[in-house]
Amino acid sequence: KVMTIFGTRPEAIKMAPLVLELEKYPEEIESIVTVTAQHREMLDQVLELFKVTPDHDLNIMKSRQTLTEVTTRALEGLDNIMKEVKPDLVLVHGDTTTTFVASLAALYNQIAVGHVEAGLRTWNKYSPFPEEVNRQITGVIADLHFAPTQKSEENLLTENKKAESIYVTGNTAIDALNVTVNDDYKHEVLDKIGDDRMILLTAHRRENL
């Protein structure tokens, strides 16, 4: 049993191709998708795009939620699900609060953890905040480290992670692009722009709010 856990739009984009791949082998792998819905609306958009249906949805998002509230609700919910499902491996992605909490819940239940997009570091615990600490703690807990680049692998080796536990896999964002790039996407805004140049800016970083 392999349980993928994510809660935000960026996680969903990068984990969806992995979920789709796991589901190609139903006889060998029981794929279980669990979402915390740390970002509800943005998460649902991605799930619909990739046609991924969660097996478990904690739906923890609340207006003006604090990090403590997210952590508490996610930890309790994931602990209950893990006790019920008893997966053999938990896969998490990146550096969100969901990532950190899912890893911690797996540790408490003595379940192996695989960390996708492992090894990114700034070495400054407040930049990005709280993501740098989230990914460092997840790195301590993880049994398998799927690093996107050789630089990420070097960071993990610097932290004395075992070389045999590290796999340089590239970034699953490329896989997500390959899944969607052939879609004949149309939108009235794009029709109005025509061939004009466009800048797309997404700015929801905690530091910008």
Question: For each predicted feature, which ranges?
Answer:
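N-terminal subdomain of nucleotide-sugar transferases
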Residues: 1-37
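A nucleotide-sugar donor-handling region in carbohydrate enzymes
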Residues: 34-36, 40-41, 141-209
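Proline-aspartate-enriched helix->loop->beta-strand connector
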Residues: 86-88
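Conserved beta-strand elements of the Class I
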Residues: 3, 91, 199-200
